[in-house]
Amino acid sequence: MGGEGFTILHASDFQLDVPLGGLRWIPESIEAEVLGAPEVAAQRVFDFALQHQVDLLALTGNLLCPTNSSARSLSFLEEQFTRMHEHGIPVVWATGSIDPLENWPTSMTWPESTIRFDRGSVGRRVMTLGGIDVEVLGCGGDAAGNIHPEWFDGLSRGERQLVIGGGTVDSFKRLDASDLWVLGGRNYAEH
């Protein structure tokens, strides 16, 4: 049908717990801006989603390392997910190599509209995006940040499917599970 569609905003690898790197030294006059750059960049993603009223915010891995992060970074992320919920924008988050679900503090609360997919297995959820029912297949990558096409073997193929994954795919020749794949990348610091 003509005119059907929905909008997905995709972001990955916020790494809120990692300071901006690659600089030999930071001039004192911009030190605060450099130190706050990861949070400012992430804030802009959430602001963009609200400004453009996207149908879905897809986050694919490595948002932050929950065991090494400050309370400020954890609180920031929780606040942003709540903002999305309050404005009717669901967040689908597929974990990456540094942010598996088992490492998150149990005290953190997640809005109902936040769907989290962990690494190593495929989860399924039907969502209505822009008035269209879409089956979302989600998974985080393995510990090395890879998503293996065989994880999707045996899953039924629907007309409107979307894969959201927190990692990279080892072989693009076998991507039969869906026509649309939204994937995170590997952390370049790991290479």
Identify what each model region corresponds to.
Residues M1-S75:
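N-terminal active-site segment of His-dependent metallophosphoesterases
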